[in-house]
């Protein structure tokens, strides 16, 4: 398989690649509208507008302890940017997520029922290793094995990217003087654009001495890797547009759903019933949702492989020669066949489950347009170390706490988040009319070695100039004089 430059770029975009989906500033906000449906489908009932349209929104987040970028920040995009692999004896990870929302529309049918629909492009990926030692002075595999005596090597990586179209329905289940319960359901039809996985299990080497030299020989382990077959359709000599048509044409359908509910504890203060917005007032709002219950299916590409039972005479120097510059995946596979006793292709299909998770959100309004929101996200996905043909992508976010000041037109937000890998970030966001701009980690702005951990989001949301105009039966209204 040889993709060429455009194919490589496409592969990086789709394969190394995200509640609202990481738009942390507006989680729980009554003004989130169509952008909030991804965090809880019931939330679309708690927006004081008859409609709103997210023309587009874009979110990117990365997190790693394996790589550091140097001389780079949002304030200083230097010309001498470099990167290095982080040293130390530790587990390593790199995770990435991305989403693009296009024309997401929310329509209030009444104050007690609403719908939303739109299209999204989403991409998730993560690579994780077992404990291994590394430093940037290593020159070859012999030196690497030397500082990793008695290490058992394990690693796995999964990526999935897809296009989805969704429709959401939400309605009020009960509404009394003290509380209200809203529930919502989102149905999604998906098209898997790109899928890939890789595994290394129980790899080990055996130390041997030959004269004054220490040699390491392969001892045990098994590996497998696969990718979606549409990459095989990318051909050199064809135009990029023709390749894209062929690439996207060889994809499969999938389906997913979201479930959510929001429970409101109403304010018991005296309210002005002539003010429409008092309908949306609450003391507490508690949301619970199950998100991304579904999967994408991919056919195996021609160069997908499984390998086991290493040959006993393969030395560290042989690995340097055979894999120093593999060039293409086909050449890599040819080299792999010379160092193991069992190697074969992989046929049929594999599944990658979406980042299924339980989300609990609590929102507490304060005085003078201030509020605070807490959001807990718990991944419900399985392990990527198994022997089956089902794999999982996962959400990076674990816990967020977001103080905010917000009106219809303006907003300032301070999301504080803890990731599933223990990263602690302080971000911020601002809303100015239809525009929302945010960053996940302030360190991206000021420090020149933190760009690998963080990201940004932006959204353009169109809303009407006035609030909800309730459509009521006017037959019993008093006549106007």
Locate each region found by the language model:
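Bacterial Sec-dependent N-terminal signal peptides
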Residues: 1-25
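Subset of outer-membrane beta-barrel
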Residues: 21-481
